[in-house]
Amino acid sequence: MLKLINPLKNLPTPSNISYMWNFGSLLGVCLLTQIITGLFLAMNFSSDISTAFSMISHIQRDVNNGWLIRSIHANGASIFFIFIYIHVARGIYYSSFFFKNVWISGILIIFALMATAFLGYILPWGQMSFWGATVITNLISAIPYIGMSVTYWIWGGFSVDNNTLIRFFTLHFLLPFILLFLVVIHITLIHEKGSSNPLGVSMNLDKIPFHPYFTIKDLLGIFVILMIFSYSIIINPYGFMDAENFNIANPMITPPHIQPEWYFLFAYAILRSIPNKLGGVIALVMSIIIILSFCFTMNNKMSSFYFNISFKLMFWILVNCFFMLTYLGAMPIEYPFDLMSKITTIIYFLMFFMIPLC
């Protein structure tokens, strides 16, 4: 056992890494929490459209501490995405994209996480779950020639129905373990060459053991976030949820405004800003894939852009675009929100071409 622990305990770590490097460990804690709470929820859930909604009510009311487990699982997804977006932003700000294999594995993790979260959003079988599933899976029909066939295959019929829920529950149970496998690969690749640092310089002459210095730092970060998370799940457990999802799914009544969970809203706003269906789907996928471009477009002569003022300006414009798109994704498609979505989408993609020129 000590042979397994010692390499981690004595891991040479740059002495100047800040609390922005804590999010890796926080994401690991989030993933384990989601898997454990998900297993307990799966024991009491029924993947049938006639009972799924009532089973959520049963878990909340009748299962011992069921309300707490569900609240941790539902809000844990939001905390997970907050951390992963900060983690990606930190990676861009401190030039972690020069570690190409690590960066590519990280993007794969984001896609796996988004797929897992989307499938989980469908399971309660509320109004927004049903219509969200209908709208988002319908996007697959935009694929030329095979689109409709693939959509019907995913649905298990000609509409979102019982077969769809069973399939989504199965995949939602399976994907976290694939995600865990990708995370292990990601961590292995990071520790193969060592971590980056704020200055972007070689720290081979100034490294210290991971334990006790960084174990204490990581534990402090975990306890601080645990306090904030505890407040969220106990005082305001439904703060991140959509009010429409407290109504049982009804295919005969369309909600006035269909939207996914808040962490997908930036991509959803990009999708809606393109008037063509296929173009919108391509823009949606590219909103994540384009982050990979930094691996190939950034100038390797500068190992850090921390002291580059123009880079910082472009970076914060990109961050503001992300927040603006998240806000616009929750708004109805009408003036001025539709126009603002188009402008912000153009600026968002433009930043990925402008930043390498800094």
From Swiss-Prot:
GO molecular function annotation: metal ion binding; ubiquinol-cytochrome-c reductase activity
CDD domains the record matches: cytochrome_b_C, Cytochrome_b_N
Record keywords: Electron transport, Heme, Iron, Membrane, Metal-binding, Mitochondrion, Mitochondrion inner membrane, Respiratory chain, Transmembrane, Transmembrane helix, Transport, Ubiquinone
SUPFAM superfamilies for this protein: a domain/subunit of cytochrome bc1 complex (Ubiquinol-cytochrome c reductase), Transmembrane di-heme cytochromes
Entry GO CC: mitochondrial inner membrane; respiratory chain complex III
Listed transmembrane segments: 23-43, 67-88, 103-123, 168-188, 216-236, 278-298, 310-330, 337-357
Superkingdom to which the source organism belongs: Eukaryota
Note: Heme 1 (or BL or b562) is low-potential and absorbs at about 562 nm, and heme 2 (or BH or b566) is high-potential and absorbs at about 566 nm.
Function, in words: Component of the ubiquinol-cytochrome c reductase complex (complex III or cytochrome b-c1 complex) that is part of the mitochondrial respiratory chain. The b-c1 complex mediates electron transfer from ubiquinol to cytochrome c. Contributes to the generation of a proton gradient across the mitochondrial membrane that is then used for ATP synthesis.
Protein name, entry field: Cytochrome b
Protein's organism: Rhipicephalus sanguineus (Brown dog tick)
